[in-house]
From Swiss-Prot:
Residues 95-140, 592-642 are annotated as: Disordered. The gene is NPL4. GO terms for biological process: mRNA transport; protein transport; ubiquitin-dependent protein catabolic process. It is a peripheral membrane protein. It comes from the Eukaryota. Keywords: Cytoplasm, Endoplasmic reticulum, Membrane, mRNA transport, Nucleus, Protein transport, Translocation, Transport. Pfam families: NPL4, zf-NPL4. Involved in the import of nuclear-targeted proteins into the nucleus and the export of poly(A) RNA out of the nucleus. Has a role in the endoplasmic reticulum-associated degradation (ERAD) pathway. GO terms for molecular function: ubiquitin binding; ubiquitin protein ligase binding. It comes from Ajellomyces capsulatus (strain NAm1 / WU24) (Darling's disease fungus). This is Nuclear protein localization protein 4. Its main location: cytoplasm. Residues 97-108 have a biased composition (Low complexity). Belongs to the NPL4 family.
Length: 642
């Protein structure tokens, strides 16, 4: 076999372009000496990376040292192909002083300057923090991203709206079809106007933009139709200038923002499984006069009232540690958040939103920022987006007074543009609840991470003459451009998962309500009646309290949550017969079920409780060491009395 003919490869770096003659059978690490000859003298060899696209633009970047055993012909490179090179420069230190290359000395003499002409201090030259930079793209998200089962189900649906025969316009038989009776697309404007649907559902919007982005008749390559708004400075600009805030160009700076009402919503409806969920949250306000916040746990289900719709079904509300105030709440660190999420997962639930009282309504500016921050924490995974995620299904509900003086529920989401503007630190709440402020651009001379780039922001509105005009959003603009309203309600046929929610709610000690073993014993100790236990565990707050005790193992806790959500007698009997449940019952009988006969001070009562077994004349003596269950019961007993 004849040896492979040499080929010419082109290389491009921020220092310029060069060409190398190589053999197709050469391995990439063998090219390192030739590559270094064409790069600056102070280039760090371990930092050299190769890419099929300009560095920082989403290409397949690989360190050249990791390509050992990979030949040029193996990756499909042919004569004339181009590769892009990224590298870092190193500074030699001699006797405690920096020995710089002449080119770097000239750069220090010509210090980088901002757009306004102000020189950048050297200590500012640090990589920007991850927050104000753009998101990374995912190659083939339709293969790499795992969606929720509900999204997969809605993707497989046809979604078209069937119509009957129009007796006025149709001129065909019952088996025919024409333009007046053919099924409509789920985003058909005439159907939305007829049903008074203000926003498209997410999957209807997806069908609409996918039909215009990917046309099968063109036989072109597939392009993900969804792209999240990006208002942050791009990292690793291919132009080769210093990173922001030292430098910026048209390739890495975000474009101007034009705000418009979002035509779709990620979730269409919020359904509370029972009015008791709302009443229990309002009870705190009635008893304390302060506001309250809770996180919603439930599921996402198909909402049939709108084409391809999604609804959030709330089954429980968990109130994290907080301090209520007359006009708001202050959240404390939620130490057991992961444990509560795990209990919810065992019950088939997830965190789907937040609800808070706002009975002294001061406006919506700070609430929108709060909602946007939470939605940014819980993004929606989708294979239809180039970043693998798009928007969020997290909802926000507010309990406030209406015009008639009654308490009403408002459900909304922050728009995708609002979430991105909060992440990019572009907007902030104002003293006027009806408007949002655009922040001032900041060039920090003390900390590069505090530098803030603010693009131009506009919004469109209909003026007094009926014309659609564009207005400058600086210094402020109406908050309506950042909101998407949702519908809400209660089911006509309630299907309540936790049908025995009488256990005290967590973190309510300030109004005299606390969770303890005695309350737990009243609900769970059955005295031979297993149905009491099976019914008693159907309480989300009780499940979280049991999780905090750490008595049951994970398998027993999963079985407990199964009984709580399914109310199945067979599973309940299996739970009662587990060793962990026997330990729990022993603890409750020893510590929580029987109140003390005398009212002792706490310290002396604890002392007597911990020693009376050994000193009581009628106490039975065991010849064997005490079991772990008995020892654990005594420890709980001594700690819980009082």
């Amino acid at each position: 076999m004849a040896p492979a003919r040499p080929i010419l490869l082109r290389f491009e770096s921020r220092n310029g372009q060069f060409r190398l003659t190589v053999n197709p059978t050469d391995e990439f690490p063998s090219l390192l000496p030739k590559v270094l000859d064409n790069l600056p003298k102070n280039t760090a060899p371990p930092s050299i990376v190769l890419s099929n696209k300009p560095i920082g633009t989403g290409g397949q970047e690989r360190n050249i040292s990791t390509l050992k055993g990979v030949t040029i012909q193996r990756v499909g490179l042919s004569h004339g192909d181009k590769l892009f090179i990224g590298y870092e420069e190193e500074t030699a230190v001699v006797n405690g002083s920096s020995s710089e290359h002449p080119s770097s000395i000239s750069k220090s003499q010509n210090a980088p300057r901002r757009l306004d002409g102000v020189a950048v201090r050297q200590q500012e030259q640090a990589p920007p923090v991850p927050t104000p930079t753009s998101e990374t793209l995912i190659k083939n998200p339709w293969e790499a991203v795992k969606q929720s089962p509900l999204d997969d189900r809605l993707d497989r649906k046809d979604g078209k709206i069937s119509r009957g025969l129009d007796h006025k316009m149709c001129r065909h038989g019952p088996k025919g079809m024409c333009d007046y009776c053919m099924p409509l697309e789920p985003y058909a404007p005439e159907y939305l106007a007829e049903k008074k649907i203000k926003h498209l559902s997410f999957h209807s919007y997806l069908r609409k933009i996918n039909s215009s982005t990917n046309k099968p008749e063109l036989k072109s390559s597939y392009i993900p139709p969804l792209s999240e708004p990006d208002y942050r400075v791009k990292r690793d600009c291919p132009s080769g200038h210093p990173a922001w805030p030292e430098g910026i160009c048209t390739k890495c700076q975000p474009s101007a923002i034009t705000l418009q009402p979002q035509p779709f919503r990620m979730v269409d409806h919020v359904e509370f499984s029972s009015p008791d969920l709302i009443n229990s949250l309002l009870d705190f306000w009635r008893k304390s006069g302060t506001q309250r916040l809770g996180f919603l746990y439930g599921t996402y289900e198909e909402y049939t009232e709108v084409p391809l719709g999604i609804k959030a079904v709330v089954q429980a509300i968990y109130e994290p540690p907080q301090v209520g105030e007359v006009d708001g709440v202050t959240l404390h660190e939620w130490g057991n958040e992961k444990d509560v999420d795990e209990v919810a997962k065992f019950c088939g639930l997830e965190k789907i939103g937040v609800i808070f009282t706002d009975l002294l309504d001061a406006g919506a500016g700070d609430e929108i920022v709060f909602a946007a921050q939470l939605q940014a924490r819980y993004p929606k995974a989708t294979k239809w987006s180039e970043t693998g995620r798009f928007g969020s299904n997290f909802v926000t509900c507010v309990l406030s007074g209406d015009e008639d003086g009654a308490i009403s529920i408002s459900a909304y989401q922050a728009s995708n543009s609002a979430v991105e503007m909060v992440k990019a630190d572009i907007i902030e709440p104002s003293a006027d609840p009806g408007v949002m402020l655009v922040q001032q651009e900041n060039h920090s001379d003390d900390d590069a991470s505090k530098a803030r780039y603010i693009p131009e922001v506009f919004y469109r509105k209909v003026n007094e003459y009926g014309a659609n005009v564009q207005e400058n959003a600086k210094p402020s603009f109406p908050v309506e451009y950042l909101l998407v309203t949702l519908t809400h309600g209660f089911p006509t046929d309630p299907d309540v998962m936790f049908n025995n929610s009488t256990f005290p709610i967590e973190n309510r000690e300030v109004i005299g309500e606390s969770q303890d073993l005695r309350m737990l014993a009243d609900k769970l100790v059955s005295h031979g009646d297993p149905n009491k236990t099976i019914c008693g565990v159907s309480d989300f707050h009780l499940l979280c309290f049991l999780n905090s005790l750490g008595i049951l193992n994970k398998d027993e806790e999963f079985l407990l949550c199964t009984v709580a959500r399914s109310h199945d007698t067979a599973d309940g009997m299996q739970l009662i017969n587990t060793s962990g449940w026997a330990t729990l019952v022993t603890i409750l009988q020893e510590s929580g079920e029987r109140p003390p006969k005398r009212s002792w001070p706490f310290q002396s009562q604890t002392f007597i409780s911990s020693h009376q077994r050994s000193k009581h004349p009628q106490a039975p003596k065991s010849e064997h060491p005490q079991s772990d269950s008995e020892q654990l019961a005594k420890r709980f007993k001594g700690a819980s009395l009082g």
